[in-house]
């Protein structure tokens, strides 16, 4: 397969999900590399498949999807212009031309018209039951939908989705060694709830 452009996506780091945050343009709010690795494990990108990243932010999940194979494609939807601009920069720097497209869209108003049907969908923030219900019928048999959240409201939503629709529900946290004065300790990140659903019929 054709190599992906730029060293961060190829020889130095390979294509395994979890590219360090320093390689992305972002405003400080970015899905951390360990959380991205968990998300991509659930999304299971396959060659030639199309991915929707809803509320793409810096586009880090979509970039990771595209890095797995040159034929993978992604569409990222983002409401905030500054974050959409960062996502476009990351698409240009870390994916092949035409592999990752970013669309300015307010998902509170629903999905924009004309989107091609995806093989997998990720909602990393701002998930609602209505948005989930819009996405589910667009997936093919075997398509994957993954929702992440860090708020109590998101946790209540995914618990409801899990009760109503099944799927897998996990909650996990990541702690990083950090300096405490002259000593060291563990600095926890926000706990993430993650719901994964696969269409079977």
Regions found by a protein language model. Give the residues of each.
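Class I SAM-dependent transferase core
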Residues: 1-47, 52, 86-89, 93, ...
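Short beta-strand element of Class I
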Residues: 71-75
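Helix-to-beta-strand junctions that scaffold the AdoMet/dcAdoMet cofactor pocket
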Residues: 69, 96, 139-141
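Active-site segment flanking the S-adenosylmethionine/decSAM binding pocket
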Residues: 102-147
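Conserved S-adenosyl-L-methionine
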Residues: 55
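C-terminal substrate-binding/active-site "lid" region of AdoMet-derived donor-dependent transferases
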Residues: 132-193
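S-adenosyl-L-methionine
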Residues: 77-120
